[in-house]
Amino acid sequence: MQNFTVHQGVVATLDRANVDTDQIIPKQFLKRIERTGFGQFLFFDWRFLEDGETENPDFELNRINVKGASILLTRQNFGSGSSREHAVWALDDYGFRAVIAPSFADIFFNNCFKNGVLPIALSEEDVEELFQRAEKGNPYQLTVDLENQVITDGQGFERSFEVDASRRHNMLHGLDDIAQTLLHEDKITAFEEARG
């Protein structure tokens, strides 16, 4: 997992509440066994017209000023629905490093931390202000500083955010579940050898 300390990136807005994991990554694309390659299917039913190839010009992420965006700004209850980890894999593979919303579905929120995508919960008022600023920016950029737990835009917007200390540590050091286990490899090996 890639570590996350300070990230500056273009903001893409998704002005929709209750976006569920089936909208993030439709079920027909879940047959892959790799964790990569899902970005091409992110928001597939919204990003593409019925032919599945032509980009929908009305979809927010298809705007030219947000191409290459790495911060997603959206509304409440993002990531609801089924517990598929593929949703976070798709966001990560597409290039998103952080998602900002007033609230997240619990399982999706946990999956983000396990896969190196930083979910940031801000108040609805702060999210609304960011939407208004993003509409004026061309493109609009934010700096997300996980070390100091602050978001800034260099134009007067600055807000702090909270992240659990252990999750913050893991994100700062790029530690997923496997990497955390490997930190104790010597103890695991000693235990296994002692068991004979």
Curated annotation (Swiss-Prot):
Keyword set includes Amino-acid biosynthesis: yes
GO terms classed as biological process: L-leucine biosynthetic process
The gene coding this protein: leuD
Top EC group: lyase
The protein's name: 3-isopropylmalate dehydratase small subunit
Pathway noted in the entry: Amino-acid biosynthesis; L-leucine biosynthesis; L-leucine from 3-methyl-2-oxobutanoate: step 2/4
Family membership: Belongs to the LeuD family. LeuD type 1 subfamily.
UniProt cross-references to NCBIfam families, sorted A to Z: leuD (TIGR00171), PRK01641.1 (NF002458)
GO cellular component, one term: 3-isopropylmalate dehydratase complex
Species of origin: Rhodopirellula baltica (strain DSM 10527 / NCIMB 13988 / SH1)
